A protein has these predicted regions:
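A hydrophobic alpha-helical transmembrane-helix feature that marks the membrane cores
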Residues: 1-286
Length: 286
């Protein structure tokens, strides 16, 4: 299989889903260090198990939200009415605070995981649970009555991941210099759009113009689709990095980085697919 070279540029835009995989980028920039003869080398099987662990922690986070919603949130006064991409939902201040804290924790833990790889067993677990909490909030509160969109997004994500893995293992898509150049160009373009939009929104004179553009259904769909394409391409990059780790017999400690990086991208893809479905159904509701 193709190997990803160790000079891939690391880019981060932590305030949105328009971002690269920070863990995989850091892992990819490390020098190849083969395991000592008496040291366990990284293996595909253990990387798969660890990836499944992080995804399972996402489910735990989803269940945590449902439990808190039943025992705590539902008893709060539902004073907030919020419009979100064609959906209008009512919720409590406490629910919003918990969702906001989970979002901040997700951002902080992914940054710590990127810069302190040894922390991944802990930070990766917390990140995955926070993502599950946020996903559950979206599915069971924001789009209440349309919960099937969560399952539909899951089914599509499974198909996407399976398809991309087949395209990679069969060599249809290879991680070449041209591939990385296209990927980085798309990523920097999305980050540029995100920063331009943020700056424009903060300036009172341009705020109405930026809001009208970003509020346009087709513009929003186009940006979401582009972000999803980038995420899928990063999935290919993740597969290549995992090959790089295993085939170079790097120490087993790198399995945590490789598995969390893969889980990170899979969750990214799921969230973008869910966002796309929410926008489409929200538009049809109008």
């Amino acid at each position: 299989m193709s190997k990803l070279s160790s000079n891939q540029t690391k880019t981060k835009s932590s305030g949105s889903f328009f971002r690269s995989n920070p863990v995989m980028n850091r892992l990819n920039k490390m020098d190849v260090v083969s395991a000592a003869p008496d040291e366990k080398a990284a293996g595909y099987g253990r990387i798969t198990v660890k990836t499944a662990y992080f995804l399972l922690m996402t489910v735990v986070g989803m269940l945590a939200y449902l439990m808190l919603n039943q025992l705590l949130f539902s008893g709060q006064t539902q004073t907030l009415s919020i419009a979100y991409k064609g959906f209008t939902f009512t919720t409590s201040v406490m629910t919003i605070i918990f969702a906001a804290v989970a979002s901040v924790l997700a951002i902080v833990t992914q940054l710590i995981a990127a810069f302190v790889p040894a922390s991944i067993p802990v930070t990766g677990t917390v990140y995955s649970m926070c993502q599950g909490f946020i996903i559950s909030f979206l599915v069971f509160t924001v789009i209440k009555g349309y919960e099937y969109l969560g399952l539909l997004a899951l089914a599509i994500t499974v198909v996407v991941v399976f398809t991309m893995s087949i395209l990679y293992t069969t060599g249809v898509i290879r991680v070449t210099k041209k591939f990385k150049m296209v990927l980085m160009t798309l990523l920097f373009g999305m980050i540029g759009i995100s920063l331009f939009s943020l700056i424009g929104f903060l300036i009172p004179l341009t705020r109405p113009f930026v809001s009208s553009i970003l509020g346009n259904f087709w513009v929003s769909i186009a940006l979401t689709v582009l972000s999803l394409i980038i995420a899928c391409l990063f999935l290919i990059s993740d597969f290549a990095v995992i090959d790089h780790v295993v085939e170079n017999r790097m120490p087993a400690k790198y399995e945590w980085m490789a598995s969390f990086g893969l889980a990170f991208t899979i969750l990214w893809i799921y969230v973008k697919i869910l966002d796309l479905l929410i926008q489409i159904v929200g538009k049809s509701k109008k």
